[in-house]
C-alpha cells in the first residue's frame, strides 16, 4: 500500500495504522479462539515448549545435593491404559535418570524426556534416596497430569537404526530375571520378524514385532546377551553324556556332513538372524524333514509322481558294486572308493554315510543340475543338513513333517512322536512350514499351497542371501 503525502498526512497515517492494528487484533483473537486447546491437549503440553527454564542468578541453586545452573519443568498427562515407555536408573552419581525411551511409546511421541536426563522431582516430591524399583513404582501408580523437574542432558544426534531380525527362540520378558524392567519387555516367538529400532545398549535392544497391532517398541536381549546366556547353559551341561539327539539306530549308520563340525558348533548358538524382505521369487529346493517312519518318503514319492515336470530327486552316489540289472544313474551313480574319497575331501557331498561297508552320498552337483533344468530339487535329508542347504544357492523351503496326532498311540508311534519333538525343539528356527501328517493327500496339498505361497508373495530371507 502506498500513501500519498498531503497536508492531512499525519492524521491519515494514524487512522491507517489504527485500522490495521484493529484488523490484526480481531484476526488474532479469532484464530486464538479457534485453536484453543482442550484440557487434555493443554495437559499434554510440556513447559519446555514454553521455555520455562529456571536459571540461577549468579549463586548456584541446589537440588538433590547437586549444584545446578539450569533446570527445566515438563508436564504430560499419563494415560492409565498405556505405559509411559520409559525406564529409569541411578547414574554414576546415584541420581535418578532416564535409562531409555522406548520407541513409539507415550514419552517418545511427546519428546518431553530424553535418555540421560536427570529427574529431580515428580509431582513436587524429591526423588532423592529412592531405588530404581521405587521410582518405577511411583511412575506406574501416578495418574493424570505428571509434572517433573529435570536436568536435561545435552543431546547429540544419533544415526537412526532400522534393521530386521528373525527371532530364533521364544522370549517372554515376564520369565527373564535379567531384564531391567519386565513391563518394558517385548514378547515374541520363534520365527517372528522383529524390527530393531535402537541398539545403543549393548545388552538390551529395542524392537517391535512386524505386523503387530502394538505400535511402540519393547526391550529384547541383544544377540550378545542371548548367546552368552545360551553358551552358559551349554557349558553347564558339558558334564553330561553327549549322544545323538536321535538315539534310535537307523538303516544308514555313521552319517556325516560335508562341512567341518566347528562351523556347526557356532551355528548351534542361536539368537537372531538378520533378514531382508524380497519380492516373490521361485524356491529352488524343497526339503522334507521328519523322524524315521513319519511318512516323508511317501509324501516325496507322491509329489514326484504327480508333478514329474516340476520336481526331481537327486540320484545318490555309492561305492556298492553295480549289480546285474542296475542302470547307472537310475537309482544310484556307481563310483569307486577312490572317487568317493576325493569327493569327500573336496566337500562336494551334501551328506554321506556307510551301510554294509559301502559308502552312499548325495553330491551337490546333482542338485545343481536339477536347478539348471528349471526344476525343484526334492530332498529328504537329516535335520543337520538344513544348515548347509540354507543358502541362496539352494533357495530352500524347509518343511517339517510331524506324526499323526490321533488318539490311538501305539508304542512305535510314541517313539516317533518323541523323536519328532526332539527334532522340532532343536531345529525349529529353520522350518518354514510345520505340518501334521494325519493324511498323506492332505499333507501333499499343504506342501503344494506352502510352495505356491512362497513363490507368489514377498518373503523374509536371511540377509546373506542378498549381500
Curated annotation (Swiss-Prot):
May play a role in the regulation of neutrophil polarization. Extensively palmitoylated. It comes from Takifugu rubripes. InterPro entries: GK/Ca_channel_bsu, Guanylate_kin-like_dom, Guanylate_kinase_CS, MAGUK, MPP1_SH3, P-loop_NTPase, PDZ, PDZ_sf. PANTHER family: MEMBRANE-ASSOCIATED GUANYLATE KINASE MAGUK. This is 55 kDa erythrocyte membrane protein. Residues 73-154 form the PDZ domain. The lineage of its organism: Eukaryota, Metazoa, Chordata, Craniata, Vertebrata. One of its GO terms (cellular component) is membrane. Pfam families: Guanylate_kin (PF00625), PDZ (PF00595), SH3_1 (PF00018). Residues 283-452 form the Guanylate kinase-like domain. It is found in: Membrane. Keywords: Lipoprotein, Membrane, Palmitate, SH3 domain. Belongs to the MAGUK family. Residues 160-230 form the SH3 domain. It is a peripheral membrane protein.
Amino acid at each position: 500500500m502506498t500513501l500519498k503525502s498531503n497536508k492531512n498526512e499525519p492524521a491519515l497515517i494514524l487512522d491507517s495504522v489504527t485500522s490495521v492494528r484493529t484488523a490484526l487484533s480481531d484476526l488474532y483473537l479469532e484464530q486464538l479462539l479457534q485453536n484453543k486447546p482442550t484440557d487434555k491437549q493443554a495437559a499434554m503440553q510440556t513447559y519446555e515448549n514454553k521455555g520455562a527454564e529456571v536459571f540461577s542468578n549468579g549463586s548456584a541453586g541446589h537440588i538433590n545435593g547437586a549444584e545446578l545452573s539450569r533446570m527445566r519443568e515438563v508436564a504430560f498427562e499419563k494415560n492409565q491404559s498405556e505405559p509411559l515407555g520409559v525406564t529409569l536408573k541411578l547414574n554414576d552419581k546415584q541420581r535418578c535418570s532416564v535409562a531409555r525411551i522406548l520407541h513409539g511409546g507415550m514419552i517418545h511421541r511427546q519428546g518431553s524426556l530424553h535418555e540421560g536426563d536427570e529427574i529431580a522431582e515428580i509431582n513436587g516430591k524429591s526423588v532423592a534416596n529412592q531405588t530404581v524399583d521405587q521410582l518405577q513404582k511411583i511412575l506406574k501408580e501416578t495418574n493424570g497430569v505428571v509434572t517433573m523437574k529435570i536436568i536435561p542432558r545435552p543431546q547429540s544426534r544419533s544415526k537412526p537404526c532400522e534393521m530386521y531380525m528373525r527371532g530364533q527362540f521364544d522370549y517372554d520378558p515376564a520369565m527373564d530375571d535379567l531384564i531391567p524392567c519386565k513391563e518394558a519387555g517385548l514378547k515374541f516367538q520363534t520365527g517372528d520378524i522383529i524390527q530393531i529400532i535402537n541398539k545403543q545398549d549393548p545388552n538390551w535392544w529395542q524392537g517391535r514385532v512386524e505386523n503387530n497391532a502394538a505400535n511402540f517398541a519393547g526391550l529384547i536381549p541383544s544377540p550378545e546377551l542371548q548367546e552368552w546366556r545360551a553358551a552358559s547353559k551349554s557349558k553347564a551341561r558339558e558334564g553330561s553324556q553327549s549322544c545323538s539327539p536321535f538315539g534310535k539306530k537307523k538303516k544308514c549308520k555313521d552319517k556325516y556332513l560335508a562341512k567341518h563340525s566347528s562351523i556347526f558348533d557356532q551355528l548351534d548358538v542361536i539368537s537372531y538372524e538378520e533378514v531382508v524382505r524380497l519380492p516373490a521369487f521361485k524356491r529352488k529346493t524343497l526339503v522334507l524333514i521328519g523322524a524315521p517312519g513319519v511318512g516323508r518318503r511317501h509324501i516325496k514319492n507322491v509329489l514326484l509322481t504327480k508333478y514329474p515336470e516340476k520336481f526331481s530327486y537327486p540320484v545318490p552316489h555309492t561305492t556298492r558294486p553295480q549289480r546285474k540289472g542296475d542302470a547307472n544313474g537310475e537309482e544310484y551313480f556307481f563310483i569307486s572308493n577312490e572317487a568317493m574319497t576325493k569327493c569327500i575331501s573336496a566337500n562336494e557331498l551334501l551328506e554321506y554315510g556307510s551301510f554294509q561297508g559301502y559308502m552312499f552320498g548325495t553330491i551337490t552337483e546333482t542338485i545343481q543340475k536339477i536347478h539348471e533344468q528349471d526344476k525343484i530339487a526334492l530332498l529328504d535329508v537329516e535335520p543337520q543338513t538344513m544348515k548347509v542347504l540354507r543358502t541362496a544357492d539352494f533357495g530352500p523351503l524347509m518343511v517339517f513333517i510331524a506324526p499323526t496326532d490321533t488318539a490311538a498311540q501305539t508304542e512305535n508311534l510314541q517313539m516317533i512322536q518323541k523323536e519328532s519333538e526332539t527334532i522340532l525343539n532343536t531345529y525349529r528356527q529353520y522350518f518354514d512350514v510345520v505340518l501334521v501328517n494325519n493324511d498323506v493327500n492332505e499333507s501333499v496339498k499343504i506342501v503344494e499351497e506352502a510352495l505356491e505361497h512362497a513363490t507368489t508373495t514377498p518373503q523374509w530371507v536371511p540377509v546373506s542371501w542378498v549381500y
